[in-house]
Structures are given as C-alpha cells and as structure tokens.
Amino acid sequence: MNAIFEAAKEVVGFMAARKWKFCLIGGLVVQRWGEPRFTKDADLTLLTGLGEEEKFAEPLLERFRGRRADALAFALTNRVLLIYASNGKDVDISFGALEFEVSMLKRATLFEFAPGFVFPTCSAEDLFVMKAFAGRPLDWLDAKGIAERQKGKLNTRYILRHLAVLCELKETPETVQEARKLLV
C-alpha cells in the first residue's frame, strides 16, 4: 500500500504546485470513511470545467506516462486521465465539472493517512454518493461500509439530493432507493 501512497503523493504534489483544485476519491479514501480494503491505484478528481480539460491533461502527460497510447484522446472523450506515477503505480484522474464535483472539492478536507502522507480527500457523504452512483458490487460494499462506520454522522439529505440529480442523468432512480436503505 505504501507504493500507492507514494504515487498519490507525487501526483498531489504536482497538482498542488499548480494550485489546481482536486481531492482524492476512491479506494484510498475508503480507508478514512469506510471499511478499509486493498486498492491497486490512486483515484483523484481534478476540477477542469468543461472545455478546459486539455489545459490540465497536457501538463500531466508531460510529467507522467499515460497508461494508453491514446491517453490524451481517451481522457478528452471519457473525462478520465489514466497515468503511471514514476514508481509504476496506476493513478486515475477524473475531470470534474458538475455541480456535485464542485461541491465535493469545496468540502474536501486534509487527512493524514500516515506520517508524511497528508492528502485532501472527499467527504464521507461525497464518497458515498460516488460509490452508489458507480453501482458496481464493490462500490456498494464500500457504500455499506461508509454507512456503517459513519452511522449517525452522515448528512443523509445532502447524499440523497446529489445522488438523485446524478441518477436522473443516468436514468437509474432505483439507485437512490438502494442508497436510502443503507442510510437508515
């Protein structure tokens, strides 16, 4: 796991030096808010807005090797840049632009995972929203772990409001109902 933290530290340092708005999301942040588990990569959201993605992707690809030959084209099409940190570990950088992502980055707080590894991370509520929205079996397990570990501390109204908006775009209203069951 230390190699993943080293990879995150390197990419976070690069982004912070440019004063970009970003935070860790995904499996590393599950350690803070949910049931800790193994993860093979570091995931971040980087606020790029719409139409400005290339201004962020190009400097990242000048510094870090893309995980695909068409890394820039893939990133611009799919809104996620797949790179390797210098230690060879995978880092996924999602390009943020939605109201939810802007809110998530404003709510992000610093967390010390271990000495020397302090990163901005999304809130428990925002991580729950992303996990429920993704909806894969492992994501639902993570959402359940967050709900259990943070029982009584989560802003359920915030979660359900943002999840409902995202699920409307994806046309998956049943996701909100599943999430509501975990939050009671």
Predicted regions and their residues:
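Compositionally biased terminal segments of proteins
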Residues: M1-V184
